[in-house]
Amino acid sequence: MRQYYYQDCALLQGDVDAVCQSIYDNRADFSYATPELNVGGTNAAPSGVYQDGDPPTTGKEYIYEIENDPETEGYNTWSVTYNV
């Protein structure tokens, strides 16, 4: 999967967090070189602070992890669009 567009679905914050966590939990299974996630638009902002959480527990920490691979696990990093 290359692009996961889930914007403008009026998702609640917990739902946005769940989408981000699901991608984080399965990060090693995505083989496309430049995957994209869009959970912006009419959706709520993900919870938390955009930072390296070890382990991540909030939506923005999951986003940080999949965008940066701070533990250098070697998975393909994502481009993520979300509401702040």
Where does each model-flagged region fall?
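N-terminal capping/linker segments that flank leucine-rich repeat
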Residues: 2-3, 7-84
